[in-house]
Amino acid sequence: MLETEYTYSRTDAFVMEKIIDAEYVNINHIVVAPGEAVPTHVSNSWVHQIVVRGTLSLSLEDGEFNHHPAGSVVAVPFNLKMIIQNQGSETLEFFVVKAPNPRTMSETKKI
């Protein structure tokens, strides 16, 4: 078998899990219950968030929140402050694709 299969949690409970940490890409899986949030952080690479369930509420650089429903792919540039919340009534589930892998990027600003 030439391909590699990776698994991820199927849950409604909060989870942040690294699925792939390869030289060229980093892929994470995140589930956030209604009213909860991901810890505030700075994008440490070029980030693409693939929303598969619920609505992702995103504030960049302390701006107003934009809301991205399931079926959206949200691109976030390197080195921006990110606040990710689930402001909806449904569980939020999304995948984060970081390319290149953050290990190859320069240091990010401090928040």
Task: Enumerate the language-model features and the residues they cover.
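A short, N-terminal "cap"/entry segment at the start of jelly-roll beta-barrel domains
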Residues: 1-24, 40, 105-111
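Conserved short histidine dyad/triad with adjacent acidic residue
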Residues: 28-43
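Short, surface-exposed secondary-structure edge patches
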Residues: 29, 48, 64-65
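Glycine- and acidic-residue-biased ligand/ion/polar-headgroup-sensing regions
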Residues: 45-56, 61
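Short acidic-glycine-tyrosine-enriched beta hairpin
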Residues: 62-78
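Ligand-binding loop in jelly-roll beta-barrel domains
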Residues: 78-103
